[in-house]
Every structure is written in C-alpha cells, then in structure tokens.
Amino acid sequence: PYGEDALRAIARHREMRRGKGFETIERPRDIGGLMLPESGLPRCALLECLTTLCANEMFTTGGITDPSEKIIQGIKKLAAQTEKLVIVTNEVADDGIEYPAETMDYIRIMSRLNSRVAALADTVTECVCGIPLTLKGELK
C-alpha cells in the first residue's frame, strides 16, 4: 500500500471490521507465502482486494509482468488453509474506454484473472449498487 489514499482506505476498512472478530493481515504481494494463524475456530479468510493485489504484483518489479499464475497458485494455497475463502475483486473492463498500453495490459490480465478465479469458486456474486446478484452457485 502506497500513498495517503491507500493508508486512509486501509484505516477505513479496519474501522469497519473493528469488533467483528477479524484479524487483519496486510500482504500487498505474494499471498502464496502467507501462513494463516492457527485457531480452534472454523477458518474463514477474506482476500481484499484481487485488483489491488494484481496491480501490486504487476507494477512493482521494475517492469510489467503477468502475475496471474502466481496469484492463482497463491489463492489455492490460501484456500487450502481455510474452510471458506471470500475474494473481493472489481470489474475493470466494462467502461469501453481505451487507456494507455500499460493500463490495457492490466485490464486484460484482470479480466482473465477474474475468469480463472470464478472458475475455481463454488459461488460467484456480483454486487451492483449494493444488491447481490449470484452468478454461480448459491449465496449462503
């Protein structure tokens, strides 16, 4: 997380989750290397946000790389440590605007990554104006 905007967003998200039993682990890259803390409770994890993770992996190496496989393998490792993994992502390709090449690369990679994550998921729910629309499986 870089810059004041990112730090404010993190603080806002932490405040929203205060007192709700969440343990926040900041991991801007390499989620495959994350080992979740042991607990006696059923384990649920929230990965927020796939779009930010992808950008962090793509643009922090000094050049643009496609991090899709690294992220998918990381998601599989994280899912193996939990009973339920919830992933927050964003639809980044629906505005129809042509952006500079680097941004278009990101949009294409995110579109493919979202498709791959949806294929792995038991349930896919899109929220439109706060209204959940289940696209795959059953919302529980």
Where would I find each of the regions flagged by the language model?
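Structured helix-beta-strand junction loops
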Residues: 19-20, 41, 81, 120
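Short amphipathic alpha-helices and their capping/turn segments at secondary-structure boundaries
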Residues: 28-42, 70-83
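Short, basic/glycine-rich phosphate-binding loops at helix/coil junctions
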Residues: 11-15, 45-59, 93
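Short coil-to-beta-strand
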Residues: 42-51, 83-87
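Conserved P-loop
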Residues: 1-39
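Short, surface-exposed linear patches
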Residues: 15-20, 46-48, 67-69, 108-111
